[in-house]
């Protein structure tokens, strides 16, 4: 269950500085209800099972890359890593992510940092014509698949085509330690749509840095 922020708590987030924009919890945080216009929201929030699925899926993929078992790339394979942290769930990151997901506006919010660190973000959306929604794993797999366009010979983030690989690189950013996600499932024009927002701390995707230290 997600608890509405008190006015004071939301106000604290208004003091957090980002490179641009007002903090998502300052803007929208006093209501945890979806704000989706004509979209029929069926579920908002992440269940415990889904939370475990998200964390496990991330860590399995991070370990696969860290061990040098990811053969895809442009060119592949991806080199093994020596500093791949094991991600743990963070409720504060999740609360910020859920608040943004609740706006049903596909894309990135402008300001999501915490007092502890700068926060990165991945977003995914998928629609099906059936009566079910794409699973968390299915959405996360879309981020993993971007590895096919990543060139490990260009060591830093900035040398790669960010728009094609940015979700992958945040997923396997070695120094990132925590993750928290928000989710909205809704129906619009008979399409069952699942919108996922994941926040990561400390953030990855610094242009001048390697995505992880190589073995």
From Swiss-Prot:
Location of the SCP domain: 55-200
Pfam assignment, any one: CAP
Signal peptide range: 1-10
Protein keywords: Allergen, Disulfide bond, Secreted, Signal
GO cellular component: extracellular region
Cited InterPro entries: Allrgn_V5/Tpx1_CS, CAP_dom, CAP_sf, CRISP-related, V5_allergen-like
PROSITE patterns, sorted: CRISP_1, CRISP_2
Similarity remark: Belongs to the CRISP family. Venom allergen 5-like subfamily.
Name recorded for this polypeptide: Venom allergen 5.02
Native organism: Dolichovespula maculata
